[in-house]
Each structure stands twice: as structure tokens, then as C-alpha cells.
């Protein structure tokens, strides 16, 4: 059995760890609320662009943008994989990368190649370990994502699809459901689903005038729409990260509390045993006299 001094040292060590995890839990809770606000604020922008693009597409059926055309010519599929830059957020990244691994095996069985863009250090490290072809990446996004940091890597994928080098583009991220639940998602980004670009009846009743022309506006809007979808995925992933980290740190703090209680019980038993032994020795000594 360990000595009382050793047990006290362990208790002190676990208490210090608990202070750290508790502080990280509080920081993550604060960041989570801000991340949720950014996530909700990004949705109206993408919804409005989608409505305008849908109106244009249905009002000009004779023009078909490359983002709406499905192709099977290149036998290459693109992935935009959104993960975190840091760890200590439970199994969030593991769950996302697990569905990526499953999809990669399916594509390999079909004889298709894969090109990937990594957003986040964890995804980049994973892709490098498995030997995937990473065409671009963005790391150190921070707690406040900016589209400026994402446009470069995203444009690589969009240009490749527009040039016919990719058959499809998927985005993988963790969707924020609530504080206790986050779900890994894999969604087809390109070609755009036609059902997502259906205009409301009210918007079709208006006859808009577009300058310089409808085709130019469609070209620009669809690119902005796809960028908005990716930004939304990053915002969702960030909210999920902070939520998962808060839950993980709370669990760590609770576990540390349990360990401290157990160590204190062991310490008290050890101390009681030492006292009992000393008393026995005193009694034995007195009897001998």
C-alpha cells in the first residue's frame, strides 16, 4: 500500500488537473454560445442566395451552369473535409473521419480516384497518414472563421469540377444538433441538387431585371452559394467542436472528482491503519513492561 505522503501527492496532482479541465469547460461554454450565434447568423445569407439563384435558374431554363451538370467522365471524386485544429473534443473528429474512410473504400472498389481539401489540422494529418492526395488545405482557422481563409482551397475544388476534372464533390463536417448531440455529415456539394434550387411561388411571380445579364449573375451567384454552404459547414463544425469540448471537459472534471474521493478514502484508510499499528505497538510495549 502506498504511503500517506504519496497518496497526498496524487490527490494534489488530480486536483490541479481538475482545475484545468474545469477552466477549459467554462471557456468552451463561452465560445460555444458565440459559435452558435455565428452559425445561426450565416444561414439567412445562404438561404437568400439560394432563393435568388433558384429564381434565375427557373426563369432561364435554357442555360445550364456546370455546377448543375452531372458527369462521370473523370472517375475522380473530390472531398472537402472539415475537422478541428485542436483535440480534446471527444470522438468528434474520429466519427467524421470514420465515414470518410468508409466512403473512400467504396470509391476504391469502384475504381475511382480521390482528391481532397482539408480544413483543419486533424483532417490534414489523417489524410497525410493514409496517403490521400491533398490538393489544398486551410488550417488555424481560429474561433472566428473568415471566408477569406477558405476561398483559396475551396476554389481549387470548384475550378477542378468546372473543368471536368471531378465527377462530384462532397463536404464532410460535424453538424450541430444541440449541446449534447453532434452528428457527422457527408453531403454532396456538387453537382448541386436540383430540388435545393426550387424557387418559391411568390418569387417567381416577380419579373426581375438582371444586369449585365441573367447568365452572368447565375455564374456569380452559384459560386457564392457553394462558398456559403462550405462556410456554413465550417460554422456548424466550430459550434460542434466547442460543444463537444465542453461536454468532454465536464466529464473529465467529474471523473477527476471521483478519483479524488477514492484517493481520499484510501488515504484515510492508510492513516487509520498507521494509527492502529502505533497504538498496538504502544499497548504491546506497555504489556511487556
UniProtKB/Swiss-Prot annotation:
The UniProt GO MF terms for this protein read: ATP binding; proton-transporting ATP synthase activity, rotational mechanism
What does the subunit section of this Swiss-Prot or TrEMBL entry state? Answer: F-type ATPases have 2 components, CF(1) - the catalytic core - and CF(0) - the membrane proton channel. CF(1) has five subunits: alpha(3), beta(3), gamma(1), delta(1), epsilon(1). CF(0) has three main subunits: a, b and c.
Please indicate which superkingdom the organism of origin belongs to.
Bacteria
Q: Which family would the database say this protein is a member of?
A: Belongs to the ATPase gamma chain family.
Q: Which UniProt keywords apply?
A: ATP synthesis, Cell inner membrane, Cell membrane, CF(1), Hydrogen ion transport, Ion transport, Membrane, Transport
Protein name in UniProt = ATP synthase gamma chain
Q: Name one GO biological process term.
A: proton motive force-driven plasma membrane ATP synthesis
Q: In its keyword annotation, does this UniProt entry include Transport?
A: yes
Membrane topology listed for this record: Peripheral membrane protein
Q: What does this protein do?
A: Produces ATP from ADP in the presence of a proton gradient across the membrane. The gamma chain is believed to be important in regulating ATPase activity and the flow of protons through the CF(0) complex.
InterPro entries the record matches: ATP_synth_F1_ATPase_gsu, ATP_synth_F1_gsu, ATP_synth_F1_gsu_CS
Kindly list the GO CC terms recorded for this protein.
Answer: plasma membrane; proton-transporting ATP synthase complex
* Gene that produces this protein: atpG
Q: Which CDD domains match?
A: F1-ATPase_gamma
What are the subcellular locations of this protein?
Cell inner membrane
Q: Which Pfam families match?
A: ATP-synt
Keyword Ion transport set for record: yes
